[in-house]
Amino acid sequence: MRIVNYCLNVLSAGVSRLLVRSKVLPEKPTEQYELNSKNPTFYIVRLNSRFDLAALARVCKRHGLPDPREQQVLGTQRLDRFIGIENPPPLIGDIAKPTNALAQGKQIIDHLLSSGQKDVQVIPVTILWGRAPGKEKPGLSTLITHSLTPSWFRKLFVVLFSGRDNFIRFSQPLDLSLLVDEKADVNELPQKLLRVARVHFRRQKLAATGPKMPSREQLFNSLLASPTIKKAIQDEAKAKNISQAQARQNAVKLLNEIAANYSEAMIRVAERFLTWLWNKLYNGIDIKYTEQIHELTNKGHEIIYMPCHRSHMDYLLLTYAIYHQGLVPPHIAAGINLNFFPAGGIFRRSGAFFIRRSFAGNKLYSAVFKEYLSQLFIKGYSVKFYTEGGRSRTGRLLPPKTGMLAMTMQAMLRGIDRPISIVPVYIGYEHVMEINTYLKELAGNDKKGESIFGIFKAIKNLKNYGRGYLNFGDPISINQYLNDNQPNWRDDIHPTDVQKPQWLGPQVANLADQVMVKINNAAALNAVNLLAMILLVNDKHALSKPKLLAQLDFYLRLQRDASYSNKVTAPEETPEQLLTHALKLNKFDVISDEFGEIIAINDKEKTLFNYYRNNILHLFAVPSLIALHLFREKTTTVSKCQQLVAAFYPLFAKEWYLRELDEDYITRILANFVDQNLIELDGDNIHITNTNDCLAKLDMLGKALNFTLQRYAIVIGFIQTSNGIEKAELERESQVLAQRLGTLHGIKTPEFFDKKVLVSFIDNLRAQSLITDGDAGLIGSVQLCETYMHLKALLPARVWQSISDIVQGQCK
């Protein structure tokens, strides 16, 4: 029998070498899980298959792990390392013989109990052939090639058709000491071990492939049979005086417009195309904090990805990154503007479902869409949508649109069993493809519709776009959020009717803000946005190379030692390496003279660079405010710095979606300034190091906030110098003054006089009770007056004089 087994293993290994290409996750399992190849090692898998064993053996050899085909010495015993929970069924019949897994588990546990040895590694390994979720009603191809437990004959077809898409995921070794320490019947422990493994593999399969897919016809029929849509069809027939059949047909048309038509084959094709595209466009894609998603899937959570929206490239980048992490691509809420030929069909088969900008006046559409979204959650599909609603044209986060999040919570009120978690995602680029279009739109040009010609133009202009960045933020469990903030939320659960309790709106708005905060917590610094921070505050947007490198080193050390959040990622390269990389992107001019090199932003890029600076300006808000104060005062105290930050931080927090202020943050910033020899700290007293280099560094850092503080001064100035001003007048006059100030002082940043930004700031002042409604209009509080005096001390005299002259002239 041993000879037969040996021959079969050799044969399967040969076939594996010819036909199988395995993708392994994590990429370095030995480092990720601190695996020790010298420790006793076992691999527990779902299926006892020779092809699975052969594929695993090749991967283990590549990563320096013990061979799963060999036996492991454990005490006086020799045990098979490969533990398969289930045997494949025979060629004829459905009942498979039981495996030796239970006996193997018992032998391992008996050894642990008798010897006390704690270094035994039992590693769960998920092995999948292809990532197709399967059909609820299998077709011929499914019967031949796809089965969780195929016979050896069907397994040949599986390897033949899906061998190039073999997927192997190692998981954290099972903590057997916890299992052994439990006060349970010793005889039950092996069964519990296998039960834990089965649950794990079921969740891993669901995370990698998603639930089984119904046919489009099945999906539509189930949706049309729901009580909610039935009632909406009846209402449609009455309202439009048409027959039930016509109203039903209208609902079918809407479903065809909305519903995704997910195809794993399309995903595979797209994955290969996107791999080629990224290599053409980018020098690499940096992806961070993926382990959080795997923790959620291991716990059986449904996931909602909520990224910021910089570019149409986001759709591709995030889906690609998720797929490469061994997770099923989410169903993506895409604007109806993207449903054009042929892109619409490609997006739809890649998991996109389409949403109109407004549901207003169309009750049938609203009912159909909400029911479709509810079914996605009920069936267990992951979903992705952009909480900003559209792409940011300025580089800063847009105020969240809460419609999709509200519908998500309403779906939860249908009584979904599984927990649902939101994963905020920060996306950043060193070059945004649409940046020139954004600038034109901010200048007042009409937004152009999407078309296939735009895509061809983008592809034609393929060039070096630097690096892309994708950071997964801290997850938010919606269930836990509601438990904490709305403890009685389960009282409103109804299995069929769409619920809209009074608490829904406020809780959705608050949750949306938390998502935005966590997106900004996970921001990514890169060469372009850091250089934008430095060069945009300098005359002519240029700086000598030595000073530029010194300032870049200052910022890198500041962000590494006194980071706003532990999720912020900073480049690991040296300033010199970052500058060399940035110069290859054709965004900078290098001017040489007898004194050395000067680095300047290319003329055509100067206004565009405000976009990249806005991506990370929030990370420098507090350091910049402190630096500006230090530069102006030269001598101050820690207490005054804390008071200044306390005055402005609520305004910053609303504008940039910042988390609650951590007092330790100010301490860490000042400590970093001390370490970089910018200040001297003597108890509460701070003295600036009075050297030219020190002054220049603090001046450049402080200037990063200039435009923001000038906007504040414009709005607050009108309020403080009037006896009351109407909101509409305040908005209008503030925009006019901002435009005038821009002309006087050469400010070309589009959002400086963007009405939306000014209106948002005024709304924030009201929300924080810094302004209130009086008989004559808006009036300021005492606290606002104090903020106004702080602004007067911080802003340059010539700028303050320009603001003061115009404000006082207008308010006479």
UniProtKB/Swiss-Prot annotation:
The gene is plsB. It catalyses: sn-glycerol 3-phosphate + an acyl-CoA = a 1-acyl-sn-glycero-3-phosphate + CoA. Keywords: Acyltransferase, Cell inner membrane, Cell membrane, Lipid biosynthesis, Lipid metabolism, Membrane, Phospholipid biosynthesis, Phospholipid metabolism, Transferase. A motif (HXXXXD motif) lies at residues 308-313. GO terms for biological process: CDP-diacylglycerol biosynthetic process; fatty acid metabolic process. Pathway: Phospholipid metabolism; CDP-diacylglycerol biosynthesis; CDP-diacylglycerol from sn-glycerol 3-phosphate: step 1/3. This is Glycerol-3-phosphate acyltransferase. Its EC number is 2.3.1.15. GO terms for molecular function: glycerol-3-phosphate O-acyltransferase activity. NCBIfam families: plsB, PRK04974.1. It is found in: Cell inner membrane. It is an enzyme of class 2 (transferase). The HXXXXD motif is essential for acyltransferase activity and may constitute the binding site for the phosphate moiety of the glycerol-3-phosphate.
